[in-house]
Structure formats: structure tokens, C-alpha cells
Amino acid sequence: MAMLVEPPNGIKQQGKHYYSMWQTLFEIDTKYVPIKPIGRGAYGVVCSSINRETNERVAIKKIHNVFENRVDALRTLRELKLLRHVRHENVIALKDVMLPANRSSFKDVYLVYELMDTDLHQIIKSSQSLSDDHCKYFLFQLLRGLKYLHSANILHRDLKPGNLLVNANCDLKICDFGLARTSQGNEQFMTEYVVTRWYRAPELLLCCDNYGTSIDVWSVGCIFAEILGRKPIFPGTECLNQLKLIINVVGSQQESDIRFIDNPKARRFIKSLPYSRGTHLSNLYPQANPLAIDLLQRMLVFDPTKRISVTDALLHPYMAGLFDPGSNPPAHVPISLDIDENMEEPVIREMMWNEMLYYHPEAEISNA
């Protein structure tokens, strides 16, 4: 539970109060009353809380010492920039970013999100049974949120069950945009090492210089397979093993299916693998709806140019009765996430402060 404590240096900042949870100090705005800690990661601690002004339950994520690691600082800045623009039922909403007391020396960042009950990883590993309707509804919402992001030229690049939040009504929201990029960005990010390995598309594993929205579709396929089978479909131990597991399922590729591989060494590796006829997905998931298997087969296509698009996946017969194109308008404008990866800490700090001001216009006025 959350325990009210005195400020560590005895000096209380105006408009703040102090709580301890899981040996972590929360210095938060007085309008928020913490309830209990609900999650912990490399970034810090998340707690559930109530906004006393609106009586709304929210999740507060404390990112501790955000500037200790520049990569983490850039991830946080990227998430702030993206979520300020995004408004969609299937994307997590960032409600507030608390304004620290000191503009030039703050170390911690407090993000306030809408509160969800659990995530898809927890549901998959639980003993709770999942009907075909459950599987279909989760997939539909994931594709719907992704279609919106792709309409804004945003690649998520780190889709996995733990980044899909779910509530008691089975509503699903995509979260964690620290690795997201614009699909029309420069080549610098096109060669980065991204996405949790098990959900990583072949073109990323093969270090291709160019990739697009189809990387997210592959991740969706891996997630959907995991929903159907209650275990990861490609639990690779390292990059080369990951590719071998993929070929064992999708089968050895024709020359025409590996033209997208622009790295000669990577192409030679794929050609060197023992021949595999592949495994039909209906054998892996015999209880699954045949239409679900057909759609999954179209998502888990090795060649990204032949992989089904998000829009076509939503129009697939398995999604019949769920998708209404008119109720899923695109994002109003493309969102730019182009950030100079070599920025120094003071510049990143100032950019974060400016993002925070969008949630605190009164502070901007008082500082004018």
C-alpha cells in the first residue's frame, strides 16, 4: 500500500506530497492520491491512484533518474511527443505529465495514464479460458489501433503481449511507444536493433536496411498465435535460432521470397538452412477457428512484400461483423518522431519540459 511520508530533505515543494511504495519515493501532485503499486520494471514503479479533482482512477508511472541513461531519456521523450497527439480507443491515453519543481535539474518523470486492469501477457499465462470470440476481439482491437497508428506514419516496433493493456471488459489498448518511429524517417533508425526477439519480423532479424509497417503485422501474427496456443510460437534463444524456428514453421523460401534481403551475408544464411516443408498452422492450433488460421497464415509470411496489410486483415472474413471502416477514421495529421539521437542532456531536458507544459498551460502563462 501507499504510505504518506515526509520529503527526504525536509523541504516540501508547493503542490506536492510524498508517498513511499515498494521502497520508492513518489513526489506527486496533491490532486493525486496513490492507492497501491501495481507494476515494476527497469524504468521504475507504477501505482494506481485517484485524481481527487475528477474522481478518476489512473496509473502513475515514475521513471526514476530518467537522464542516467540517454537511450531511456530519448525513449521517454519519444513517448511524450507521440501520446500528446494520439487519440484512439485502442491506444493508451496519457492524461497528464507532472511538472517538476525545478526546470533545469529534475531527475524523475511522472506520467499519468488511464488505468487498465492487466495486460495480455498475464491473460495468456493465466488459466482463464479464451473463447474464439475473445481471441477475435483482442485481435480486432489490436489491428484497429495499429491501423490508426500506421495512418499517422507511426511504426510501433515493439508490439508484444506485455505492451497490450486489457481491462475487465476485454477492452485492449496499445502502450509503450518508446521504440516507435515514423515510417518516413531517416535511415539512422532503419538499422537499429529493435523489438523483443520473439516478435521480431524476419526483415529485422536479417538486418535489412529498409522496412515498413509490415514489421508490426508480423508481431501481431506472433501475438495472435500466442493467444491461440497460450505459448510463444517462436521462442528463439538468439537471433539465428529465431530465424531457424521461423523457417521450421513457415517453410524454406523460394528465391523470389528472399529478394527483399539486401544483406548478402543474411541471404546466404537463409539459403544455408536445412530444407523445411514447414508446419501447417492448423496442426499447431487444431482447436482454432479455420478462418483464424487463414488470417494468421497471411500475417506470418516471411516476405514482407507479400504479408497482409493491417487494412486487409481487418477486412478478412474472420473479422466479419466487427470492422466498420467508417468508425475508424485515420489520424488527422502525420506525427513526426524524428529526434536527434545525439542530443545532450540539457536539450532533452528542455524538450521534456516543453512537452510537460502542454498539460500545464497555467505554468506556461505564469512563466511568460
From Swiss-Prot:
Keywords for the protein's UniProt record, in alphabetical order: ATP-binding, Kinase, Nucleotide-binding, Phosphoprotein, Plant defense, Serine/threonine-protein kinase, Transferase
Motif stretch (TXY): 191-193
Protein's recorded name: Mitogen-activated protein kinase 7
UniProt keyword Kinase, yes or no: yes
Free-text activity regulation comment from the record: Activated by threonine and tyrosine phosphorylation. Activated in response to hydrogen peroxide. Activation is triggered by MAPKKK17 and MAPKKK18 in a MKK3-dependent manner.
UniProt PTM comment: Dually phosphorylated on Thr-191 and Tyr-193, which activates the enzyme.
Protein's organism: Arabidopsis thaliana (Mouse-ear cress)
EC number(s) reported in the record: 2.7.11.24
Modified residues (Phosphothreonine): T191, T196
Gene Ontology biological process terms in this record: defense response; response to hydrogen peroxide
Phosphotyrosine, modified sites: Y193
Role noted for this protein: MKK3-MPK7 module acts as a positive regulator of PR1 gene expression.
